[in-house]
Design a protein with these regions (language model features):
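Short, Asp-centered acidic motifs that coordinate Mg2+ and/or phosphate
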Residues: 30, 124-125, 155-156
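Conserved beta-sheet core of the metallophosphoesterase superfamily
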Residues: 61-63, 84-86, 133-184
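Catalytic metal-binding/acid-base residues of hydrolase active sites
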Residues: 16, 37-38, 68-70, 97, ...
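Active-site-proximal beta-strand elements of phosphoester/diester hydrolases
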Residues: 6-16, 102-111, 125-129, 176-181
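Divalent metal-coordination and catalytic microenvironments
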Residues: 14, 36, 62, 67, ...
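Core catalytic region of metal-dependent phosphoesterases/phosphodiesterases
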Residues: 12-100
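Binuclear metal-dependent hydrolase catalytic cores centered on His/Asp/Glu-rich metal-binding motifs
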Residues: 101-148
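Short acidic-hydrophobic surface loop/beta-edge motif
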Residues: 2-3, 94-102, 168-172
Length: 184
């Protein structure tokens, strides 16, 4: 758990459809899922089940950042999924920033090109599915994400995707980079 501005934040990723087997600690004001909640969201019921489970978690803010297994966000059906989540009180962050009662959370995709003037200077948490290049990435990280972290200097960068480095942290300048994958 992370505490910022008296808000308690819990984050995870990579449940791959096993979310009901996963224990979320009590007491979080903000719960973040950094993607790969399902194995294949195009199959139907698995995604709906995740939305039901995630929306029922006892936190004021629920943030979802799609991963590479949330294929519908890449094939043009993301608006429908995002609407379903919004109706259940879940905020989908993709290349966006959300102020969660004084905790500023942002997300970028691994191939975003963001102009320097558009980089937020007050970002508390950056959430991505992919890791930054060279940081707990098993040689699969994103150079764009690394550059964004170096320029924006968030307090935390939370990501998943790489199961082999699940739970590990790395200090990158002022930023604590943490792999929040729950699958090893």
């Amino acid at each position: 758990m992370i505490i910022i501005n008296s808000s308690t934040i819990f984050a995870f990723s990579d449940t791959h459809g096993h979310h009901r087997d996963f224990k979320v600690p009590e007491g979080a004001d903000i719960i973040i899922c950094a993607g790969d909640a399902v194995e294949d969201d195009l199959k139907g019921g698995e995604y709906d089940d995740f939305i039901e489970w995630f929306s029922a978690l006892p936190a004021k803010w629920k943030i979802f950042v799609p991963g590479n297994h949330e294929l519908s966000f890449e094939v043009g059906k993301g608006d429908e999924k995002e609407k379903m989540m919004a109706e259940k009180g879940i905020t989908v962050l993709q290349d966006a920033v959300e102020d969660c009662d004084g905790v500023v959370i942002g997300s970028i995709s691994g191939n975003s090109i963001i102009a320097d003037e558009d980089i937020p200077k007050d970002l508390d948490i950056l959430v991505t599915h992919m890791p930054p290049y060279g940081i707990l990435d098993e040689e699969m990280g994103s150079l764009e994400i690394l550059n964004f972290v170096l320029k924006s200097k968030p307090k935390y960068h939370l990501f998943g995707h790489i199961h082999a480095t699940a739970g590990q942290e790395f200090q990158l300048g002022q930023t604590i980079c943490r792999n929040i994958s729950v699958t090893k």
